[in-house]
Amino acid sequence: GSSAKLNFELEERRRFEDDPDYEIVIGIDLGTTNTVVSFMRQGQIEVIPLDNGSRLLPSVVSVNKNKKFDVGGVAKRQLLFNRDDTFFSIKGFIGRRSKAIDSELLKNYPFKFVVSGEKLQVYSPKLKKKFDCEEISAQILKKVKLESEIFLKKENKKCVITVPAHF
């Protein structure tokens, strides 16, 4: 009964903390507004703190004055003074053909969209470069991977990522 469960949980904790080969699979909910990452420990889902201890990472990417990517709260704060180079709500455009997107909708964003063939891209004035929406979302995933590895004190090689229903 309960002693067998306790022994299993103790064994799992030992493996998690001590065994360098114990693989952790993280789950990432790459949201339009926020991103969350979790993992299972002792049969319970645990959400990993990402952005200065917050469990929600704003799904925002910006190019800072040093021409580097910022992700999360730092990027979101740049919406006030760096609107052309701060990208948000990008997930909804991943995998969609440019023809299927209402061009009037794109005018509501402070950053510039560019149609390149069938693809929709965003333009960074600081970098003078176009990026696929997937590349912007990849910056969020890189941040999540780094933050989760710091928290777990292990390299993450496996993950599950949620995808929108229209995929």
Briefly describe each language-model feature range.
Residues G1-P58, K65-F167:
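N-terminal phosphate-binding loop and flanking beta/alpha elements of the actin-like ATPase fold
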